[in-house]
Amino acid sequence: MVALLLFPMLLQLLSPTCAQTQKNITLGSTLAPQSPASSWLSPSGDFAFGFRPVEGNTSFYLIAVWFNKISDKTVVWYAKNTDQDPSIVEVPSDSFLQLTNDGALSLKDRSGQEGWNPQVTSVAYASMRDTGNFVLLGADGTTKWQTFDMPSDTILPTQVIPCNKTRNKSLRARLDINDYSSGRFLLDVQTDGNLALYLVAVPSGSKYQQYWSTDTTGNGSELVFSETGKVYFALTDGTQINISSGAGIGSMADYFHRATLDPDGVFRQYVYPKKANAGILGGETWTAVSMQPQNICHAIVSDVGSGVCGFNSYCTFDGTRNQIASCQCPPWYKFFDEQKKYKGCKQDFQPHSCDLDEATALAQFELRPIYGVDWPLSDYEKYEPIGQDDCGRLCVIDCFCAMAVYNQSTSTCWKKKLPLSNGNMADYVQRTVLLKVPSSNSSQSMISTSSNKWKRNRKHWVLGSSLILGTSILVNFALISIFLFGTYCRIATKKNIPLSQASSKSQLPLKTFTYKELEKATAGFHEILGAGASGVVYKGQLEDELKTNIAVKKIDKLQPETEKEFMVEVETIGQTFHKNLVRLLGFCNEGAERLLVYEFMTNGPLNRLLFDNSRPHWNTRVHIALGVARGLLYLHDECSKQIIHCDIKPQNILLDDNLVAKISDFGLAKLLLTNQTRTNTGIRGTRGYVAPEWFKNIGISTKVDVYSFGVILLELVCCRRNVELEVVDEEQTIVTYWANDCYRSGRIDLLVEGDDEAIYNIKKVERFVTVALWCLQEDPSMRPNMLKVTQMLDGAVAIPSPPDPCSFISSLP
């Protein structure tokens, strides 16, 4: 036993007395954690391979590669057990690592039990290179194994990660900056040729959601960190998608470089000056020079998992140039573990017991306002119209309610329950979050002093903006196609079958109204909201407890369809729901009367907002564009059958009280059957927004909606109609022509002249215009699908320069 204990000490005596700078590492060389020979250096001394103490627990060590000449010895690679078990190799101080005389690299503990080896044999020597790559080589100089082939969370200049045909190669973020355990984010170089970032489960690593990608399925070749400092994804056709440009970041001679998937899910490229106060970046610290995605707090909204931060917390930024995400608890909440904030937050008081009666609950709890935080999910009830006091009372007496959200302008109240997910700072909605906490008169005290401290200083906690409304999981049923629904009413009437019973399969959760009910609700169909080809829309109010505002459409023009086709279509549409589709509340099928009842959209159609004298804020227009894109994506790709809207225009995009865009009026919609990508039909839509293929003898596809969206996107950017005959410069008459000319001449700024907010965000303006020009390609096959469109708008994928569209004929009135 004594011999075993003395063995590592004997190895230290036989080994060199310090970490040596050497070109080759010979067989028999040994490292031990607490000996002078604890690492092998590269020839320049820039990098080291060996034992690195674990932060916070110096009794244990990693097998790692690190930058050796900088003060914090930044780790760029660390050993993991196996692909099947990606846990880190963490060993006690009496372990040793040896390049054995048998030609193997072996990590053993004091008893001689092997704890790790890279599973290669016949090694003749090893080398720690100045690139940061530790290599095991054969006698003929061929590489047997290298750390560059087994990346952890970082890549270095000259490192290449190819798309493997049989197994994904990936970077896995750490769990925390000082915790090297496999974390919650993954950069995947996939076998299908795509490079993507994923939110993943811990510890299993199963993928939750992709939140950024190059969208290069079938075309990707390799992820490259060039020796000039440029990070890009090479494609099989020889082109490159830049992850970072490499421009303006200083020479490789003056700076150390690395690109790391950080614990907050952002893939950042960093530089560090090799000399004190060197270069324009200055400072002896790592500085981020590029990052993907640009705003991680807004990039992830996942139905599964907690989002960027843990449950019941929210994501903001640390205020530094590196834009590191910072997770925070709302007031009266505290972290489960201050050292592991990714675990989320919990209430710092005794939760509301469901055994309390209403009077006791009102005595023990109250609501306190907070501002500027957004938890987009977790809604479970909505009240409208209602006062703020009543909104608060309904939350206080409900043991499931953790907070209420109130909109003063529309008298609307939403209740949210725990756990709260996807929390982030938000600056684009004016609403108040009412957080349920112990009453100031209650005998219940806060559990920790941190919450009391916040309570005393809560006036300083105002964050300066308000909460975005999440989608209610109980109330987001999309409206049924007017055309299809009217036909269904006629079929059901002819057969003397009540509409609600005509299909036992569809089981649509819709209310049946009588004609008298709707006549009374609309005060005799008095106030007209709008009119379309199939009928007139009136404003009304239901006589329910909440006095719900509604929009009632009287259908007066129907076309016959076969019952079989209609039943297939109505069942499909009736089962759809999305926050960017207007919700159908019910219907009337009484005699010859056909009426549809919709949720009322406070701010009316987009054209009213967009083309009035006052220009909407740039961020408002951005959110509207993204909302319309996501609504179309749902119709095209996420329904059981694809739905082509066929009439996307500003008049058919309605805005709720928070200016959330919702697609409406499915009167011209067309469904595609399974495995069908095109359909033949007569010309539908509105002049100025219909795609060129409508005028040709070819089938139409979802790409007609993509074309219409391209027109609307330019209207949102420019805040003007597609065609304006009274402009001074006739070259600006048709916005699609004008935008193309501005893009080709490099004068995108002319499209937003006088719009200071847009000018400030000119890069995003250019991105939106580029996406629009892709949508407006005359050849439908050249247009992106709506998934690609949303990714391009979000900045999740690179956007190549669009071809010059051959024709904008359909934009003409």
UniProtKB/Swiss-Prot annotation:
A GO term for molecular function: protein serine kinase activity
Intervals, Cytoplasmic compartment: 488-813
Chief localization: membrane
Membrane topology: Single-pass type I membrane protein
Annotated ranges, domain EGF-like: 293-346
Catalysed reaction equations from the record: L-seryl-[protein] + ATP = O-phospho-L-seryl-[protein] + ADP + H(+); L-threonyl-[protein] + ATP = O-phospho-L-threonyl-[protein] + ADP + H(+)
Signal peptide (UniProt feature, chain positions): 1-19
Residue ranges the record marks as coiled coil: none
PROSITE patterns per the UniProt record, alphabetical: BULB_LECTIN, PROTEIN_KINASE_ATP, PROTEIN_KINASE_DOM, PROTEIN_KINASE_ST
Any one Pfam family match given in the protein's UniProt record, by short name: Pkinase
InterPro entries, alphabetized: Bulb-type_lectin_dom, Bulb-type_lectin_dom_sf, G-type_lectin_kinases/EP1-like, Kinase-like_dom_sf, Prot_kinase_dom, Protein_kinase_ATP_BS, Ser/Thr_kinase_AS, SRK-like_kinase
Positions annotated as glycosylated: 24, 57, 164, 168, 219, 242, 407, 441
Keywords: ATP-binding, Disulfide bond, EGF-like domain, Glycoprotein, Kinase, Lectin, Membrane, Nucleotide-binding, Plant defense, Receptor, Serine/threonine-protein kinase, Signal, Transferase, Transmembrane, Transmembrane helix
Active site: 647 (proton acceptor)
Any single Gene Ontology cellular-component annotation: membrane
Family of the protein in this entry: Belongs to the protein kinase superfamily. Ser/Thr protein kinase family.
Name of the protein this chain belongs to: G-type lectin S-receptor-like serine/threonine-protein kinase LECRK1
Species this protein is from: Oryza sativa subsp. japonica (Rice)
Gene: LECRK1
